[in-house]
Amino acid sequence: PLWEEKVRVDANATFSRNRISNYTAWFDQYDNQENYAWMGQISKDYGSTNISYSPDVISAVGLTWQPGKAFYMNLLGKYVSKQFLDNTSDESKSIDAYFVSNLSAGYTFRKTRMGEIDLQLYVNNLLNSAYVANGWAATDSFTDGSTIHWIGYYPQATRNIMARLTISF
């Protein structure tokens, strides 16, 4: 059948459970939030925790249509599960799971005066998803027992388009 020769589906998935069996965190301690005089460090035992930036699931599925030797089109979807920004497994210091899809197409001009020309077009983040794929976290502790969590996120690009031209001679 026609679809067997022209359509390909690729998929992959990684499932993991990355843990620290007995985690102890060290935090800078300050006298108070007004003065911020450094008093040293304190430790806190968390027991078994998730390793930072280690999602439990990463998966992707791609659909490629190639009706001939010169043209192709590919749709790719990628899912990444929740990640923690540090090793404490604190929900407030985590990145939500996200799904992003990309579309690409290409055409090869095989016999030209300049040689072989490949023209490719990419539409990244096709669904224009707002998502975060990385970040940082830190905690300041105070002698009265209070804490401040500093959290920063690195949002990823919304929909963007890129083209590539390759000339082989």
How should each PLM-predicted stretch be described?
Residues 1-83, 87:
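Gram-negative outer-membrane beta-barrel transporters
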Residues 12, 102, 124-128:
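Asparagine-centered polar/low-complexity signal
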Residues 55-59, 97-101, 115, 157-161:
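Residues that define the transmembrane beta-barrel architecture of outer-membrane proteins
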